[in-house]
Curated annotation (Swiss-Prot):
Pathway the protein takes part in: Cell wall biogenesis; peptidoglycan biosynthesis
Disulfide pairings: none
Residues forming coiled coils: none
Gene expressing this chain: murD
Main location group: cytoplasm
Compartment(s) where it occurs, according to its Swiss-Prot or TrEMBL record: Cytoplasm
Organism: Haemophilus influenzae (strain PittGG)
Taxonomy of the source species: Bacteria, Pseudomonadati, Pseudomonadota, Gammaproteobacteria, Pasteurellales
Annotated keywords: ATP-binding, Cell cycle, Cell division, Cell shape, Cell wall biogenesis/degradation, Cytoplasm, Ligase, Nucleotide-binding, Peptidoglycan synthesis
Entry-linked PANTHER family: UDP-N-ACETYLMURAMOYLALANINE--D-GLUTAMATE LIGASE
One GO process term, biological-process aspect: peptidoglycan biosynthetic process
Protein name per the record: UDP-N-acetylmuramoylalanine--D-glutamate ligase
Binding sites annotated in the UniProt record for ATP: 112-118
Top-rank lineage group of the source organism: Bacteria
Amino acid sequence: MNAYQNKNITIIGLGKTGLSCVDYLLSQQANIRVIDTRKNPTGIDKLPQNIPLHTGSLNQEWLLESDMIVISPGLAVKTPEIQTALKAGVEVIGDIELFCRAATKPIVGITGSNGKSTVTTLVYEMAKAAGVKVGMGGNIGIPALSLLNEDCELYVLELSSFQLETTYSLKAAAVTVLNVTEDHMDRYMDLEDYRQAKLRIHHNAKVGVLNNEDRLTFGENENQAKHTVSFAENSADYWLKTENGKQYLMVKDEVILPCEEATLVGRHNYMNILAATALAQAIGINLDSIRTALRHFKGLDHRFQLVHQANGIRWINDSKATNVGSTVAALAGLYIEGKLHLLLGGDGKGADFSELAELINQPHIICYCFGRDGAQLAKFSSQSYLFETMEQAIEFLRPTLQSGDMVLLSPACASLDQFASFEKRGEEFTHLAQYSV
């Protein structure tokens, strides 16, 4: 008899992740109920009809009748109904905890405020180049539980702070917290509360990859990996060497790759490459396979992506920059011949935008602010314009563009005030950029 057979388990949240929990727990012969606080949740049509479903609110009675609650990462454990269930002795976990209890192959775990998806995909490509049967999922692409159905020798998981809050059994082969900057401040008490959720990834890990430029990423107390390696521009195991005007990605004294041979560009991407290389080497991936992946990896959509170039003007879609730290990373070390036309705005999620002030208050940077928090962002630049929508901003700036200029969508905000997702925002930007011909 398995641990879930005949247990009363309530799954909160449908969508891809919720349905993966349903499929897995059905295979374990559990008695399942599903709750979704939305009236018409996505995935409702894929739920087997014999499974009880409650929508529109949290059903406290169902929660208290449960042996276990599997909570959606989108719902905070601090929610009163969940706290009531916890006080009554009901176990509350997430889908990643279910996965970790079942997985028998090594896991690489990646979290951080920015760069998670790029590093996760890089490690996946490096393992694939080495001939390893590897599955990638979690907060990216496929729900982790769905990977259990695949023939994998290795799992590479992108993990959000929300997922880590309800994960207790992760014993990863290698992990990293890439960086910690303000994000989801509408969910956490403060930056330290958010950071502690991220640091849970280090618990029981064999190797922790540390960002030497960000002490907030270092594990502490029970959340420390057994062994650590570091990455940074200088003074680290994995570092960036500059010699005769050229840059090289290094591990100790060995060249991983000249930066000009990597398909990813920009200092923030070089840090991502170093972190991914450290993780890959920690699980035994050889440098030749790592080099192959780095030469062929094209990057991910909506992440500092060149979507149009004409008449000497570059249009860059960085719609995935949904927080201040991500936009800071995009602007750091950016060299432009002409003007930078920076599109900022959306839902700031309660973040402090002041960190942007010094970076954007430059003679060559003009800010075009839009969306819910556009007015707040516009205050930080002496050269700013305010619009209701991104489209209005682009139509305004278009006639002013000259050769050498860059139009950069790196909004420092979530998109949900005006768009269905950051992808939709990026797609609209791309469409408007390509229309510029």
